[in-house]
Amino acid sequence: MAFFRGQAAPLPPGGARRAPGGLAGAVRAPPGGRGLRAPSAIGSGRSRGPGRLLPPPPGGLCNACGGARRRRRVPAAASPRPPREAEEGSVSVVLLAGGVGKRMGAAMPKQYLPLRGKPIALHSLAVFEALPEVAEVVVVCDPAYRDLFEAAAATPLKFAEPGAERQDSVSNGLARISSASALVAVHDSARPLVTAGEVQACIGDALEHGAAVLGVPVKPTIKEADGAGFVAKTLQRSLLWEVQTPQIIRPALLRAGFELVAAEGLEVTDDVSVVEALGEPVKITLGRYTNIKVTTPDDMSVAEGFLAEREAAVAA
């Protein structure tokens, strides 16, 4: 027995079988007949159980009944919200280049040592100057090195004096930025391998949360020691991050943090620590392990290797 277009297929004994998701299952044709797949609507209605038919769905009948079957709407999967983008010229950079670099054991501060023919600090400067989001760069350095930066800069620079501690240097640089800046990015000039993509990702997180810092999950096991040099406990590695720079913060938030640190005599070792002291959130932006701080001769060799690989990749 064959079924023709427009003819309702008889339900099997007990009614139509329901397929997962609430649709009727396939109807088996009698021997010698042509099989017919029963959609959600059969004949003039939809099967909801043995012998029970409901009115046809809005929009018409199914194909088996000679009408147009309404397609089932499937909700779209939620897509992640794209990162926020800063407006052009809305970010000020404080480039820290006032360190002495005693651990390098060189005749000059580490940030001025040549790395593949160019001082380390100038590699860092070039990354930020090329970003459309960056309006200005304030270089915190000894006045004796200002000419070095001015000769290499693509745009006019501002300068600030280094302080006794890192937070003093950052505060001096912060005092020189434009009042129109939405964000201030603080970067160690001795990190010459940071990429434009990393900086822009961190800018997006800072716009969203008020403060952000580049970081990478720690690889080794970290142990906390007591005063006598014995292991006190092993820290949970999955929760630990090594933070880098840039550290990007809303200027008003950074200023408020510095005021609190000064008022309470707090000791901080990086810039987002002052935001933490305020109880405000700091987002960690996933960075790369190549964004090293050149501090020792071994670091210099590693940085040379990474930079050579990048140059070779660009030339290929």
Language-model segments: what does each one mean?
Residues R72-E85:
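N-terminal plastid-targeting presequences
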Residues L240-A316:
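Conserved alpha/beta core of the MobA/IspD/sugar-nucleotide pyrophosphorylase nucleotidyltransferase superfamily
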Residues M1-G66:
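N-terminal chloroplast transit peptides
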Residues K158-F159, A164-A225, Q244:
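Conserved beta-loop-beta/alpha segment of the NTase-like Rossmann-fold superfamily
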Residues P114, L193, T234, I248, ...:
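Short aromatic/basic micro-patch
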Residues A86-R146:
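N-terminal glycine-rich phosphate-binding loop and ensuing alpha1 helix
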Residues L95, A121, G173, H187-D188, ...:
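Residue-level signal for inorganic ion chemistry
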Residues K223-Q247:
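Short, flexible, basic/aromatic active-site loop/helix in glycosyltransferases
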